[in-house]
Structure formats: structure tokens, C-alpha cells
Amino acid sequence: MNSKGSQNVATTCKPVTTFVQTDTNTFREIVQRLTGPTENNAAAATPEATVIKTAIQKRPTSKLHERRQCMRPKLEIVKPPLSFKPTGTTPSSKSGNTNLLTSPVGTPSSLFSNLSLIEGEPDSCTTNIEEEEKAIKERRFYLHPSPRSKPGYTEPELLTLFPLTSPNSSGKP
């Protein structure tokens, strides 16, 4: 191109993206060079010359799946040897097998191993209620009882939105 522009190309695979650094004055010229001739130049060329140029310059285009295979990192599957014998050591121990990763949380059995069942005592139930009420008061959240649970509660009176009888029918027979 010219001395002001530079181009970076990946060496491991066909370049998918071309990076060009240029100034605003030469931008149009560089874009035209990268994308091909303008429409005026293409119309001015003879049809025979374009057929010969396309036959010579035509390269096999790479298909999408071929480009993706080139860009995809290779995955390796490591199988254990045939003489694999499980031992009593945990995977986190340094037994030479450093490829295994352990969870920082641990297994579910180790999480629930410290739990124990406490049979309910009548005193523990009242202390839980007292603790709950204390926490509610500290946070200034009060659970008000429903007015329906109070003695002497009667159902609210439903007001009629629409008249039950027509005013015209009551005045005339």
C-alpha cells in the first residue's frame, strides 16, 4: 500500500479480519484497493478481459465450516490408563494426577454431613417464636392480625352498583 498504512496478518490461519491504520485523506483509496475496482473501471473493461481475469484470479473460496475449524482450538481427551486403580486418596491430594480439578464447595455429602436432626421440644418452639417476634420488632416490621380473626366480625355490606329495578318499570304498568 503506501508508507502511511500498515497491515497486521495472523500467521496461524487465513486472516478473517484485516486491520489497517490510515488517515482520513487516504481512507477511500485504501478501501477501494481492498474491496476491488470501482463500478466505472469495471464497466470500462472489455467483457473478454474480465472473463480471463476472473478465470486467472479466481481462488477457491473457503467455506464457513472450514474457517471455523481453523479458528477453533483443539481439544484433547485424556483417557486414564488401562491399569487405573482407584485409591483411597482424594483428588485434591498430590498423588501425581494434577489434571483433576476439585470443587471449592465440596461434595453434597460433605456439606450435609455436619447437619443433625433435632427433635422438637415444646420449649424450643416457644423460644423460636420469641426470637422471631424480637427480630420483627428490631426491624420495625409488624404483622398485624387480620380483622376477620377478631370476635364480633361481620361480613362487610356490599353496595349495589346498579339498580335492581328499572326506574321506568316502577312508574308505569
UniProtKB/Swiss-Prot annotation:
Keywords carried by this UniProt record: Nucleus, Phosphoprotein
Gene Ontology annotations for the cellular component aspect, listed alphabetically: nucleus
PTM-bearing positions, type Phosphoserine: S92, S103, S146, S149, S166, S170
Free-text description of this protein's post-translational modifications in UniProt: Phosphorylated on serine and threonine residues by MPK6.
Motif VQ mapped to chain: 27-36
Region (Disordered), start-end ranges: 76-105, 143-173
Extent of Low complexity compositional bias: 154-165
Major location category of this protein: nucleus
InterPro entries for the chain: VQ (IPR008889), VQ_4/11/13/19/31/33 (IPR039611)
Subcellular localization(s) per the UniProt record: Nucleus
Modified residues (Phosphothreonine): T46, T165
Bias (Polar residues) ranges: 86-105
Role, per record: May modulate WRKY transcription factor activities.
Protein known as: VQ motif-containing protein 31
Lineage: Eukaryota, Viridiplantae, Streptophyta, Embryophyta, Tracheophyta
Gene: VQ31
